Amino acid sequence: MGTGAADRSRGARWWLPWLGLCFWAAGAEAARGADSGEVLPDSIPSAPGTLPHFIEEPEDAYIIKSNPIALRCKARPAMQIFFKCNGEWVHQNEHVSEESLDESSGLKVREVFINVTRQQVEDFHGPEDYWCQCVAWSHLGTSKSRKASVRIAYLRKNFEQDPQGREVPIEGMIVLHCRPPEGVPAAEVEWLKNEEPIDSEQDENIDTRADHNLIIRQARLSDSGNYTCMAANIVAKRRSLSATVVVYVNGGWSSWTEWSACNVRCGRGWQKRSRTCTNPAPLNGGAFCEGMSVQKITCTALCPVDGSWEVWSEWSVCSPECEHLRIRECTAPPPRNGGKFCEGLSQESENCTDGLCILDKKPLHEIKPQRWSRRGIENASDIALYSGLGAAVVAVAVLVIGVTLYRRSHSDYGVDVIDSSALTGGFQTFNFKTVRQGNSLLLNPAMHPDLTVSRTYSGPICLQDPLDKELMTESSLFNPLSDIKVKVQSSFMVSLGVSERAEYHGKNHSGTFPHGNNRGFSTIHPRNKTPYIQNLSSLPTRTELRTTGVFGHLGGRLVMPNTGVSLLIPHGAIPEENSWEIYMSINQGEPSLQSDGSEVLLSPEVTCGPPDMLVTTPFALTIPHCADVSSEHWNIHLKKRTQQGKWEEVMSVEDESTSCYCLLDPFACHVLLDSFGTYALTGEPITDCAVKQLKVAVFGCMSCNSLDYNLRVYCVDNTPCAFQEVVSDERHQGGQLLEEPKLLHFKGNTFSLQISVLDIPPFLWRIKPFTACQEVPFSRVWSSNRQPLHCAFSLERYTPTTTQLSCKICIRQLKGHEQILQVQTSILESERETITFFAQEDSTFPAQTGPKAFKIPYSIRQRICATFDTPNAKGKDWQMLAQKNSINRNLSYFATQSSPSAVILNLWEARHQQDGDLDSLACALEEIGRTHTKLSNITEPQLDDTDFNYSRQNGL
């Protein structure tokens, strides 16, 4: 028994005798009641309503921290009220009593309370909790109250079980478990979503009553969020770790479209139908639809058969009208499947008596003879024939003289080219003779060249007329031609000169006229009112790479250095006596083409213009792309931006079209177009095996802190212009390329990309914990056409004396390919080896015009076109030329051109602008059997000094 209980016992001894006397009296009364057969009650019996009745009994209580608690009792009628705690009487001095009178009953009401301290509860070591009870006395008996327990309140800090994050499909069940910390009294649990309380009474879909767990019966998209379990009692509140719940939507296929028409009009082709992963579209990391988005089946279209005539029948018997006839039928073969009917007459008739026939129903012998003889008739016919021929000769002579005089009167200077090699072929020199004595090619005030240009010259000028000289070749490919005499009128600046200007990031390169002639083109006026150069009223104003050049009838090539983008204007695409300032730009800002669904941008947005310019033959636009086209896992489209800013599909690369042509190479797409505008390539992955080609590179630079060194790892689309943007950014930041960039194949399998720094030298360098590996989500890499994707790592030296850094950087796709970049460098610029940004810097002028822009000499090109544009019974025509140059599809496009061979050669020029591989073209011609001499065997000495100065660099 505790010390306090003993004190209470000694203090109560003075009233115990009196209490015993009362009990003796009550016992006597009880004995008398027992003799009368009544049951002994718990309290001493008395008259009804005379025993003490508790109006207020002590309640269970909790001690918070060190604050004592008060236990109260109130009873009537009561002479005394005492507390008994743990079976021991509480000392009278610890009681506080108050007495009052109940006005309604006139009975005395006594109220007593005591304080229980934390120390008293802690010192008690009984089999049960610390408890206290009230005992009330009246003159007739006693009454006892309920036992009230007293406990020390607390709440542990750590949850026994924190809720865990979940990823569930839509309409799935979510169960978040929570076991609150141990506490007295037991903690109440409340759930928070995004720091807001959850009221399960207002949402029937949520249940929070099941053993502190949170149950969401059918997950909705709005149920995604951060959930927290909150536990609280009278002592404190505790928060669990937040659990992130993601409700995702797996993609579902839409219905199949109708089967497309057969892609060929004749023969074996294919039909396709497609569906999109939009029913529903994947959301919040949901799985992409499984299966193919495009289905293809073969189809066979009946080829149209044109009708052909049978042989003529025998002549019929001479009719009374002195005519006989013959017929033929269109049955060899007859037209079928929409083929053309035979052209020409199905029957012929002619006189069958050589003019001797009955006239007006009269016999021949009754016709009166004419006055002249048969010989006279023949002489009259000869006179008429010779008279007609003489008149024709005179008319031709007058026409030739008139044309010659007209051309001379409209020309400031001219040359007569006498080609003596046309019979034999080959590269020969030319004899020039001037029309006027003393005429030179120098610009003088008396001359008025056919050109008006609104800006100064910026680039080289070729001072010879490429059309004044023809190159011939000794080859059996070409048929001998008769002697020709060509008179060429030249426009001094349009045909002989070029105006170029390259602009990058808005910087203009000023230029002057060559040979010290610092004069603007605006001082030179044309003879007529129509200006030859049509200047642009506006150019693209977005963030872009841009280059411009002036092109005339000779055509040329416009190149964006180190971007893979180029524009080929064929010879003759621009009408004579006209020139255009043509520009080309690459959008480096936010792409205006927003991808739909699974479609991704595979190339830069390339703009060429002016948009209102018309060409007479298709030009070739080369656009780089980053798709791996070695396997058929892509559906690639060419798109064009409209004037309203929207994008519309021009064609699919695999489709047949007569409006444009797309030739897809491993790293670039060559497009033949008739109109200028903004174009881009997009791709829709057909399967998860579709691959994008990424270029990975690492740059490094010192940090502001002299001990830190920063590494930046880039993963960008494998297009030269994308990497050029990275190079430009790094140059501004002072970064240096530490290892040659490498190629990474990134699959469309929805798995993320990991970038890790490995093998850092210990005791020399260190990297912050948990930062050596970074992960990039799949969607960020797959659609990385917004800004260059990169991860930054910060390395710290232990001492300033460390100047060498070696490590490995691993770039890998989960369940995909990986690349290792080996970094071995010095952080001091004086000791670092410079790695060039590009394997071959393009230092050529952005614009080239005339023959220098083309790999195939113009004369050879003309003869190839003349040879292969002519149909051949053995099939050795332009179709064979296309086949030998790996052009096997959409041949109907070339069939619609006026010169299919010229368009094929334009495509060859676009594909071989870097290598100028004339050997491949020569081999193709040899295989066809039309030539036995390779074009690449043409040597420099065969060219005259005044010719086009082709060099080996131009492919010859």
From Swiss-Prot:
Keywords: Apoptosis, Cell membrane, Developmental protein, Disulfide bond, Glycoprotein, Immunoglobulin domain, Membrane, Receptor, Repeat, Signal, Transmembrane, Transmembrane helix
Location of the ZU5 domain: 545-685
Site (Cleavage): 419-420
Post-translational modification: Proteolytically cleaved by caspases during apoptosis. The cleavage does not take place when the receptor is associated with netrin ligand. Its cleavage by caspases is required to induce apoptosis.
Disulfide feature: 73-134, 85-132, 178-229, 262-299, 266-303, 277-289, 318-352, 322-357, 330-342
Residues exposed to the Extracellular side: 31-382
Key word Iron-sulfur present: no
GO biological process, one term: regulation of neuron migration
Annotated glycan sites: 115, 226
Gene Ontology MF terms: netrin receptor activity
InterPro entries given in the database record: DEATH-like_dom_sf, Death_dom, Ig-like_dom, Ig-like_dom_sf, Ig-like_fold, Ig_I-set, Ig_sub, Ig_sub2
Region (Important for interaction with FLRT2): 89-91
Ig-like C2-type domain: residues covered: 164-242
Superkingdom, taxonomy of origin: Eukaryota
Subunit structure: Interacts (via extracellular domain) with FLRT2 and FLRT3 (via extracellular domain); the interaction is direct. Has higher affinity for FLRT2. Identified in a complex with FLRT3 and ADGRL3; does not interact with ADGRL3 by itself.
Biological function: Receptor for the netrin NTN4 that promotes neuronal cell survival. Plays a role in cell-cell adhesion and cell guidance. Receptor for netrin involved in cell migration. Plays a role in axon guidance by mediating axon repulsion of neuronal growth cones in the developing nervous system upon ligand binding. May play a role in apoptosis in response to DNA damage. It also acts as a dependence receptor required for apoptosis induction when not associated with netrin ligand. Mediates cell-cell adhesion via its interaction with FLRT3 on an adjacent cell.
Listed name of the protein: Netrin receptor UNC5D
Gene name of the encoded protein: Unc5d
